[in-house]
């Protein structure tokens, strides 16, 4: 009887192993929804539309983008955790949802390690350290020296407490050993206006401010990634002066926990194919200098854990907490 039961279990496992790849080959058989946590025009939305358009050409099945806005992205993430884990509703989410919000907000609805499956990263973008055009410095070392000599401390702008612009500047302050006064604004546009007008003297922003920099309204003195930005190739990285400095934003694709691995792997392969296409690379470049960033689920999981450790430490040191 025991031998017969063992054979039956092996047979079930064998059938399952044969069905899973076939199931993935047939996927998708209907419309796939990509859920974006921010309004149309933001980086996750632009990435979702560019990737979704090209996935629809590969499959071919329709891919629709739905914007579910609210609670700093938690509304969209929570929604995806409660849908059927069948690969037909996916989240296109920014890293801050999972590596900053859990430590910044007293209540965070989604635990990426329990509620979602990372499929692949899609794109990345750098932050640009820009200063008021009238500030008497031309580069990062001069800015650091100027900041050290300034009394009272120079004021810098951000798009809000706990924003990645804010946290990136705090990382730079720590590495450079400078004191700057943080002035949070309601969004990046207001922070940019303040820096151009001289209410503040510096800020980290996205590469979307490249037009203002090229017009001379802001002066870019560094970018936050390991490599120079293709949008601003003449601007050095912070790491050229402070080795190892690396702080960028990334956007990823997530499925509800319980989604079959065969579908996750099918999505990963198709996404990697899309991200390698010249048309996608051009579309990303035209969307504010976003660069394709392709990883496997395991690589993405390691990236999440690395960034969680980094931001948890920083937010704890700053004693930041938002209700």
Kindly give the residue locations of the regions a language model identified:
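An extracytoplasmic/periplasmic, membrane-proximal ligand-sensing/linker region
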Residues: 29-31, 175, 214, 261-323
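Short secondary-structure boundary segments
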Residues: 94-95, 133, 206-208, 225, ...
């Amino acid at each position: 009887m025991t031998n017969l039961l063992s054979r039956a279990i092996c047979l079930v496992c064998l059938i399952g192993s044969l069905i899973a790849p076939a199931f993935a080959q047939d996927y998708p058989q209907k419309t796939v929804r990509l859920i974006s946590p921010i309004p149309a025009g933001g980086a996750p939305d632009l990435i979702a539309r560019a990737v979704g358009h090209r996935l629809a050409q590969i499959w071919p099945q329709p891919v629709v983008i739905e914007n579910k806005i609210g609670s700093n992205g938690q509304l969209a993430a929570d929604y995806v955790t409660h849908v059927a884990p069948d690969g037909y509703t996916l989240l296109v989410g920014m890293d801050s949802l999972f590596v900053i919000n859990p430590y910044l907000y007293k209540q965070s609805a989604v635990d990426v390690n329990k509620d979602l499956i990372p499929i692949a990263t899609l794109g990345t973008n750098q932050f640009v350290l820009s200063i008021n055009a009238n500030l008497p410095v031309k580069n990062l070392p001069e800015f650091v020296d100027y900041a050290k000599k300034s009394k009272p401390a120079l004021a810098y702008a951000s798009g809000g407490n706990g924003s990645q612009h804010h946290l990136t500047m705090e990382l730079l302050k720590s590495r450079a050993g400078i004191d700057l006064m943080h002035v949070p604004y309601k969004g990046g546009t207001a922070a940019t206006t303040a820096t151009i007008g001289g209410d503040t003297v510096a800020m980290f922003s996205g590469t979307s401010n490249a037009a203002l920099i090229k017009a001379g309204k802001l002066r870019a003195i560094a970018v936050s990634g390991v490599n120079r930005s293709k949008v601003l190739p003449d601007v050095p990285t912070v790491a050229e002066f402070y080795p190892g400095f690396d702080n960028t934003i990334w956007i990823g694709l997530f499925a509800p926990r319980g989604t079959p691995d065969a579908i996750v792997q099918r999505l990963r392969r198709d996404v990697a194919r899309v991200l390698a296409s010249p048309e996608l690379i051009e579309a990303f470049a035209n969307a504010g200098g976003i660069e394709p960033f392709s990883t496997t689920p395991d690589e993405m999981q390691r990236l999440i854990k690395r960034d969680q450790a980094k931001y948890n430490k920083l937010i704890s040191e700053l004693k930041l907490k938002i209700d």
